[in-house]
């Protein structure tokens, strides 16, 4: 989670670099212009949805388009309706967050991310606050996005999802990268002892 927040400049990194669109950025010292430029190409789906309680599902999706991107309201509404339809929430566009289940709120949050047409979506443990049944509906939306070619960086403990949908896995523990590689290599031929221990627990 901390790494993800540093990559989106929600927290300041102590050091390190990030390469985005062939541009290498010093994460400890990033000009505001660079932050704004990169954020326009990314979207963030939070663990606890982060929806505005006083706005409908539709308004939650249009807010960033109208306020952040200065888009005309009619165009923002059209894009928002399309995004809500994509996540199966078009019939709940006039509902407030309090009227939606956790899974439905997270799908609205994903629609909000899709609406800005990002190059990459960051997901911060998007199912950790959900019960198993609601987790399934959110993962189904994410699988569909993956199959459509959306680039996603996902912090997750959903190992089945990671195994079937990812093309690259990074296993971290206590802020340190333990192992990384292709999904196939990671799950079928792990190299590090700690990775093998972790996967053994998961497989049991």
What spans do the regions from the language model cover?
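Conserved signature/switch motifs of ABC ATPase nucleotide-binding domains
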Residues: 95-98, 116, 148
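Helix-to-loop junction immediately C-terminal to a conserved catalytic motif
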Residues: 8
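H-loop/switch region of ABC-family ATPase nucleotide-binding domains
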Residues: 156-157
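Conserved ABC transporter NBD signature motif
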Residues: 16-26
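Catalytic Walker B motif of ABC-type/P-loop ATPase nucleotide-binding domains
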Residues: 121-124
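ABC ATPase NBD coupling module
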Residues: 25-43, 73-74, 189-190
């Amino acid at each position: 989670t901390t790494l993800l927040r540093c990559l989106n400049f929600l927290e300041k990194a102590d050091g390190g670099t990030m390469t985005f669109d062939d541009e290498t950025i010093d994460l400890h010292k990033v000009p505001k212009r660079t932050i704004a430029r990169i954020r326009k190409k990314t979207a963030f789906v939070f663990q606890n949805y982060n929806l505005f309680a006083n706005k409908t599902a539709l308004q939650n999706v249009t807010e960033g388009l109208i306020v952040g991107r200065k888009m005309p309201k009619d165009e923002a509404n059209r894009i928002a309706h399309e995004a809500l339809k994509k996540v199966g929430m078009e019939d709940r566009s006039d509902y407030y967050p309090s009227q939606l289940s956790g899974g439905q709120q997270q799908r609205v949050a994903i629609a909000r991310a899709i609406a800005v047409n990002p190059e990459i979506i960051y997901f911060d443990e998007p199912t950790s606050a959900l019960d198993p049944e609601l987790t399934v509906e959110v993962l189904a939306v994410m699988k569909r996005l993956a199959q459509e070619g959306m680039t996603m960086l996902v912090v997750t403990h959903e190992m089945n999802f990671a195994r079937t949908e990812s093309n690259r896995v990074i296993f971290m523990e206590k802020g340190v990268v333990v192992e990384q590689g292709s999904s196939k290599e990671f799950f079928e031929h792990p190299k590090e002892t700690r990775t093998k221990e972790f996967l053994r627990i998961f497989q049991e």
